[in-house]
Regions:
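N-terminal core-binding DNA-recognition domain of tyrosine recombinases/integrases
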Residues: 3-20, 26-105, 121-124
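Alpha-helix N-cap/N′ positions at the starts of helices
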Residues: 2-5, 47, 110-114, 129-130
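Basic, Lys/Arg- and aromatic-enriched nucleic-acid-binding interface segment
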Residues: 113-145
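Conserved tyrosine-mediated DNA breakage-rejoining catalytic core shared by Y-recombinases
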Residues: 146, 150-197
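Hydrophobic (often cysteine-bearing) scaffold residues that line and stabilize catalytic clefts
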Residues: 67, 130-131, 188
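DNA breakage-rejoining catalytic core of tyrosine-based enzymes
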Residues: 98-116, 175-187
Length: 199
């Protein structure tokens, strides 16, 4: 199988971020295979376990698990032998998790007090207005950076009784772009309108 053609075939079916992650993980694995003259798409479980153990010398368990999950998907989609489901591979990952596993660091949540302090130090010019809008938008919608960047002015909706909402066109959990309506405050609605008039 031509791996370049394979990754090209994923376009439109998977998000750009997923394809980028698959490609990066595969290249790391493929380079390792090349070093030992292994066929990346026809490898047995013992050799794949060696790859995992070598990753364990420098990478976190979370990164290793993500790479193994990516490679498992690639093996399945290319109809190749999938060593990731073999007991020896599963046990190798379990050993690494027991030996090196640490709880993943969670991002510090943006509380209302922190939000207020951040907005208070924003300047009164157009840059400050933009920063206030982004802070309020992130706080209220709890969206990823990539999702926040997709919002458009026409996504702002006004309903009866002074209610406002934003249309979220796409998210990681909405791969088929069905969209989702997110209620927002008067404050965020006013910031969006102010920004639209300022630019």
């Amino acid at each position: 199988m031509n791996i370049k053609i394979f990754f090209k075939s994923l376009e439109g079916a998977y998000s750009e971020n997923t394809i980028r992650s698959y490609r990066s993980d595969y290249m790391h694995y493929s380079n390792w295979c090349q070093k030992y003259n292994y066929d990346p798409l026809n490898i047995n479980e013992d050799k794949f376990s060696d790859y995992i153990l070598q990753m364990g010398e420098s990478l976190t368990v979370a990164t290793i698990q993500r790479r193994v999950a990516s490679l498992s998907s690639i093996f399945n989609l290319t109809k190749s032998t999938n060593p990731t489901k073999e007991p020896v591979v599963i046990l190798t990952i379990k050993r690494l998790r027991r030996k090196f596993g640490k709880p993943q660091k969670q991002a510090t949540p943006l509380t209302y007090d922190i939000l207020t302090k951040l907005k208070n130090v924003c300047s009164d010019d157009i840059v400050g207005l933009r920063n206030k809008l982004l802070l309020q938008l992130g706080y209220e919608t709890m969206r990823r950076r990539s999702e926040i960047c997709q919002f458009r002015f026409e996504d702002l909706q006004h309903h009866g009784n002074h209610k406002h909402a934003l249309l979220l066109r796409h998210s990681k959990t909405d791969q088929y772009n069905q969209g989702k309506i997110i209620p927002i405050s008067d404050e965020l609605s006013e910031l969006i309108l102010s920004w639209s008039l300022a630019i």
